[in-house]
Amino acid sequence: MSRRHAAEKREVLPDPKFGNIVITKFMNSVMYAGKKSVAETIVYGALGLIEGKTKQDPLSVFVQALDNVMPTIEVRSRRVGGATYQVPVEVRSARRQALGIRWLITAARGRNEKTMTERLSAELLDASNNRGNAVKKREDVHKMAEANRAFSHYRW
């Protein structure tokens, strides 16, 4: 990895339906093997199901779900004189978003509904109501950080 300068961030274009950059990032994370149209169908289908079930704006449900899943603090390993400590650190905003998206998709893939569209819509609805595996993952990470609060002075 080059230490000269950080790689430039690529510009992410907003999605065609909602005009939202976060939805595009979400689609890109759902995508397998470069099949963007399949990912688009899955995400828009899930948001359509949410609109049908809740009669609410699907974008606001999505944003609420992502907010409920994004971690504010996590633990990172730090080696100090032969011992490795789990040191709690704050999460940067870009990483918060990336982790939230990743956890939502992983939780959706682990569900038992028949299609990915149904799994994703169910997980997003659960997450927007502070339930589901993605929210549980965030709670576990926060608990781990709280348990290791004694080592917070090793922060870097």
UniProtKB/Swiss-Prot annotation:
Entry annotated with the keyword Repeat? no
Superkingdom, according to UniProt? Bacteria
GO function terms (MF aspect) = rRNA binding; structural constituent of ribosome; tRNA binding
Q: Which GO terms describe its biological process?
A: translation
Record carries keyword RNA-binding = yes
Transmembrane region(s): none
Q: Which GO terms describe its cellular component?
A: small ribosomal subunit
Q: Which Pfam families match?
A: Ribosomal_S7
Q: Which HAMAP family match?
A: Ribosomal_uS7_B
Enumerate the NCBIfam families for this protein.
Answer: rpsG_bact
Which named protein is this? Small ribosomal subunit protein uS7
Record the organism.
Rhodopseudomonas palustris (strain BisA53)
Gene name of the record: rpsG
